[in-house]
Every structure is written in C-alpha cells, then in structure tokens.
UniProtKB/Swiss-Prot annotation:
Entry keywords, A to Z: Cell membrane, Endoplasmic reticulum, Golgi apparatus, Ion transport, Membrane, Sodium, Sodium transport, Symport, Transmembrane, Transmembrane helix, Transport
Membrane topology, record value: Multi-pass membrane protein
Gene: slc10a7
Stretches of the chain found on the membrane's Cytoplasmic side: 1-10, 59-71, 138, 185-201, 256-270, 320-343
InterPro entries: Na+/solute_symporter_sf, Put_Na-Bile_cotransptr
The organism's place on the tree of life at top rank: Eukaryota
This protein's name: Sodium/bile acid cotransporter 7
Organism: Xenopus tropicalis
Similarity annotation: Belongs to the bile acid:sodium symporter (BASS) (TC 2.A.28) family.
Length: 343
C-alpha cells in the first residue's frame, strides 16, 4: 500500500494531528470568545449534529436479530461499564504515586467510563468473521446506555467542574444528546429506504464534526499559559494504553473461552472487541459537557484521543491471528460433534 493510499485510509488520525497543530499555531481562532464562537457552535450545534447523525445511522431494526443472546450482552455491558472503570480506578491508585501528569491519569479514568464505539468493534468483528449481529447490538445498545451511564460514571469517579451544577449537566446532555438522537431515529423511519439506497457517509460526517470539537478543545489549551505537558508523561501514557488494551483483550478472551460459558468462537470475537473498545465519537462531546469550565479539559481528553487510534491499530494487527484461531477452533468443534462411524 502506497503512502498516499495509507494517508487516505487513515485520514481521521492524520486530521487529529493537523487540527492539534493548527490549534498550536493560532489558538485564539477556536478559543473561547474567538471568531468560531465555540461556546455556541461546538457546545450546542456540533454536539447535537453528531448525535442527530448517530440517530439517523443506527439501524435499530437490526438489533432484534441479536436481542436474545442475553448472556453475551450482559457480559459485554458489565465488563465495559462496570469492571473496566473499576479496574482502572484501582490501577490509578498505584499510578498516582508516580510523577505522571495527574490530568492525564484522570484522562485514563475518563476512557474507562466510555461506552463501546458504534463502528470500530463491528468492523473488526466482521473482518474476522465473528458474530457481527452481537457486535452491532452491543455497540448500539452500549451507545444508548452510555448516554445515561457514562456521565454518571464520570461524576462518580472524577466529579464535575465546580462551575457547572449537576442539574445543568444533565439538562444539557438531554438537549444536545438525547433529543437529537431521538429526532434522528424518528427521521430515519421516514427516509429509511432512501438511506439504504444512497448510503450517506455518516461516519465521515461525524468524524469531520469531531475534528472541529478536538480543534477548539486544543485551542483552549494552548490559549492557557498555565498548562504544561511533559513528554515523559505522554510517552508513558501511550505504553499504559497499549498495555491496558492487550491485558483486557486477553482477559475477555480467557473468560469467554473457558468451559461452561456457552460462547461460540464467533461470540468470543465479538466479546473481545466490544468489551475493550471505547467510543471517541460519544466521548469527546460528553467530556465537553461534563467538564465545561475545566482548564485542563484537553489534557483529560488526550488519553481518549490516543486510545481511539490505538484500538484500531491493535485490532487490525490482531485480525489475522484471531481469525486463524477462530477457524481452527470452529473446525475442531465441528469434528468433535460429528457422529462416530461404527466399525
């Protein structure tokens, strides 16, 4: 694959780097009170646009196909929204004794509170040949669940900014997240055939709006002379993120393949990806609302910005290995179930 083709394929990750660089060069453009007026365009319009887009693109009619696999869904959601944040909280009690930047550590906690993404876990499950219907259900259901659970987890583990009261956070979440999502689902009912025929680039649209949110977030950071990020902390956080992903992928793999769980090899693939992936699309707008007024908001966002490309990179690298395991396991199970030929 040529360099240009690779850049075109990974345009979003390239975009993140470019918008952060642009914010560094001239932070006043996207900062508070700047020409872009992020306090209106981002806080209300951009966030609402992302969730309206999610409402349009979520195929809720497909969820019924996987609805009955209760044990699998229960495991994924409990692992993602209960075990993951709790385990990271315990881990951070140890890391807080190190010289790593405390706001990056808080950022790791925010990563753990995020719901599964709508796309990446499904794409990787499909690439391996795993239980795609289960992956679709858990990604979509986790996104809906995350609208309520994620802000509660963030407030539980980190608290909100002192300038924004609890009721204000949830009223804003309702107006900019829940309402646009519901409107998107209602509109989808009426134009479903057109959407299926034309297949609008929902992912690309959300990603472009997300780049705008990331840009203004970092404009605020670089406008603040009090914020200092050391290279040591950043490098260590990258290593920690890859370690967490690998450790949790291994943990979910070992559990789902143990005896008496009843999961098929295809189920295991969906479990491994859906349980360990975290949503950037839902995460950044939520952080923007819950931590409004935090001068360190962008530092808190950094681990999530790293986690997103890391999970795609790691997942893509492991696709051939996981696929090979799944096919050999399915073959072995098929052989053991075949009736023995009498002598």
């Amino acid at each position: 694959m040529g360099l240009l083709e690779r850049l075109r394929k990974e345009w979003f990750i390239v975009g993140i780097i470019l918008v952060i660089a642009a914010a560094k060069l001239e932070p006043t453009i996207g900062g508070k009170g700047g020409p872009l007026k992020p306090e209106i365009t981002i806080t209300y319009i951009a966030v609402s646009a992302i969730f309206f887009n999610s409402g349009l693109s979520l195929k809720t009619e497909e969820l019924t196909n996987a609805l009955m696999h209760v044990k699998l869904h229960l495991f994924v959601q409990l692992f993602t929204l209960v075990f993951f944040p709790t385990a990271i909280w315990v881990f951070l009690q140890v890391l807080s004794l190190t010289p790593i930047n405390e706001w990056l550590l808080k950022g790791l906690q925010t990563v753990s509170c995020m719901p599964p993404p709508v796309s990446s876990a499904v794409i990787l499950t499909k690439a391996v040949g795993g239980n795609e219907a289960a992956a679709i259900f858990n990604s979509a259901f986790g996104s809906f669940l995350g609208i309520v659970v994620t802000p509660l987890l963030l407030l539980l583990f980190l608290g909100s900014s002192s300038s924004v009261p609890f009721t204000s956070i949830f009223s804003q979440l309702f107006m900019t997240v829940v309402v646009p999502l519901i409107i998107g689902q209602i509109v989808r009912r009426y134009i479903k055939d057109w959407l299926e025929r034309k297949k609008p680039p929902f992912g690309a649209i959300s990603s472009c709006v997300l780049l705008m949110i990331i840009y203004t977030t970092f404009c605020d950071t670089f406008s603040n002379p009090n914020i200092d990020l050391d290279t040591f902390s950043l490098v260590i956080i990258v290593f920690i993120i890859f370690f967490i992903q690998l450790a949790f992928m291994l943990l979910t793999f070992l559990f789902s393949t143990s005896k008496n769980t009843g999961f098929t090899p295809a189920d295991t693939v969906a479990i491994v990806f859906c349980s360990t992936h975290k949503s950037l699309t839902l995460g950044i707008p939520m952080l923007k609302i819950v931590f409004a007024g935090y001068e360190h908001l962008s530092l808190i966002s950094v681990p999530l910005l790293i986690y997103h490309p890391a999970q795609i990179l790691l997942g893509s690298v492991l696709v051939p290995t996981i696929k090979s395991w799944m096919l050999s396991r399915q073959k072995a199970l098929k052989l053991t179930r075949q009736p023995k030929v009498p002598l």
